Amino acid sequence: MTAIAPVITIDGPSGAGKGTLCKAMAEALQWHLLDSGAIYRVLALAALHHHVDVASEDALVPLASHLDVRFVSTNGNLEVILEGEDVSGEIRTQEVANAASQVAAFPRVREALLRRQRAFRELPGLIADGRDMGTVVFPDAPVKIFLDASSEERAHRRMLQLQEKGFSVNFERLLAEIKERDDRDRNRAVAPLVPAADALVLDSTTLSIEQLIEKALQYARQKLALA
């Protein structure tokens, strides 16, 4: 009988610390990593590389089904590898972002990418970072964590990130945008941003990164010992 690889899902809103936590857990456990938020950007970039029309659902589905992508975390840095090439920077361009929003609108593309994401489930295990990993993509995952933080704290973290990159930021505007996105994400009809019924909800508002990682790893190891 073939062993089924365990999955730890980390869901939650932007700015709660999912990316940092997932990279740390993947490195600590030496597990595979899935950054579901980057998947649509990677597909969009692959389409641009292969001159596939991003407005054609029929052309995109086979590309999505066989998308050659993997995620590697080394010393806290995430590398996105598309067809053997590090495209971590390339997927962050505005051209790719615009194309990603187009490809994400197609139902059959979303279905193909859902299957592709599930294919990341390989031994020894998978850390899945996203918004609906525990509710839609891996509903049978033995460990589910929903990571949250106050909208004010998430706006503050985002402001610091942008300031480090040299951008001038209005905190109140940033906070309003985050609250608006939260409301939209949590109330949408398809795959709303809510904790799975069996998820541990962790609030990172007052936790240091080290405390957050320790709590999550401790919980995961306890659950996996019982799984």
UniProtKB/Swiss-Prot annotation:
Record SUPFAM superfamilies: P-loop containing nucleoside triphosphate hydrolases
Superkingdom of the organism of origin: Bacteria
Enzyme class: transferase
GO cellular component: cytosol
Keyword ATP-binding in annotation: yes
Binding site for ATP: G12, P13, S14, G15, A16, G17, K18, G19, T20
Enzyme Commission designation: 2.7.4.25
Entry annotated with the keyword Ligase: no
Protein name: Cytidylate kinase
Organism: Shigella flexneri
Gene this chain is encoded by: cmk
